[in-house]
Amino acid sequence: FQPGCNCLIGKDFRRWHGACDGSVVGSDKESGMARTFYDEMYDASGNCRPHYREFARWLAETPEELLAQRRREADLLFHRAGITFTLYGDEQGTERLIPFDTIPRAIPMSEWRVVERGCIQRVKALNLFLADLYHEQRIIKAGIIPAEQVLANEGYQIAMQGLDLHRDIYAHIAGVDLVRDGDGTYYVLEDNLRTPSGVSYMLEDRKMMMRLFPELFAAQRVAPIDHYPNLLLETLKSSSPLDNPSVVVLTPGRFNSAYFEHAFLAREMGVELVEGADLFVRDDRVFMRTTSGPQPVDVIYRRLDDAFLDPLAFNPESMLGVPGLLAAYRSGNVVLANAIGTGVADDKSVYPYVGDMIRFYLDEEPILRNVPTWQCRKPEELSHVLAHLPELVVKETQGSGGYGMLVGPAATAAEIEAFRERLKARPDAYIAQPTLCLSTCPTFVEKGIAPRHIDLRPFVLSGRETRLVPGGLTRVALREGSLVVNSSQGGGTKDTWIVED
């Protein structure tokens, strides 16, 4: 251990993690959340957790130079494969390689089963909420969610009112962001129901680990995830009432931040990747332009925001969408996955009500907890937030990617005061939460191995049934002390292992 660098050199990381795991960093009596860091690999006594023992043994026996060589090889292979994302506003170039860490995040199967059941329960309730919101609005009439909270929401689409969808599914693909608090409890940080991204990195990270370290997978049973594209295609086909519907992936184009993923998923599913200009609508039917003439399209896996889907119905300046698409959709001649208007359910101002949705629609208690949340639109909660800004994380209700937020403990006094004025000017645009003690996982950094904060995004598919592959995208905040894991903010990824207990 080198003083001052907060990292480890060589194999001495076990002793360091044992000493640091569970160190108290404060308390939060109001939220009831633990204020310690949970280390995924080591317990508070410094002992390796059982599901990591095989990996820890391998890591201790593997020469450091070989590990470094494999990490360099991973970077080279990711570059060659074009596994990048686009960083908007970057003056030095738009395409970036997402840093990949070769120490996996491992989860025992018994623990995963709870996460799986909780994600399925949550997405089922969210789909029921969307079906209810765009029809009878029973949850509003019951006084559980205020009407203005959803009907005046930017994500609510009046064009969806009264429209019946096959199987009543709105969010066919959902990403549920999970974090683990200091006592090991999983919390849902947010739901992603519009165009959730990141699954391609989950799949490519696994391919990379199997290529670089096949001996690890021979020594330990890790649940497979490579069947995800097949499950996704089954889900998309089941969203249509037709026996064998034609499916396409609609992308905004190669300058979109997730274009690699759009192309990757289309290729893996064996379907066409199209842009808006490749499609047209005739007699309320969608067709794809091909060299063999127009071909009908039945299901569109759209990776395009609502506002850009149809210039005749939404943003008239959109050059990315398909004129007449909404009319075809409302006529029942094409399926959009995800449905238009799903954004109202993953809005951060609606997030506090998801537990109530589970109780209302499923008559069950939530398996996964929400993070305690203050709604700044409520005067009494705004007063609390303004009085405790240095301690809280404040987010825009429509924000994403780690932008437009304040992390109080990491902000300067000037930044806090500037944010205070923004908050007072538009309180309804913000929510606040306690600063989470995200769990840590050993991670390769420049000078060795050090703990870095992580989250987890499992991907939930809703078709004939609701299901997940055993895994997800683990994102890691690579900067020391950072709690922001988003790739747009310098975060990286890890392979996620679901292992036998």
What role is predicted for each listed range?
Residues 5, 12, 18-21, 25-501:
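Preference for protein termini
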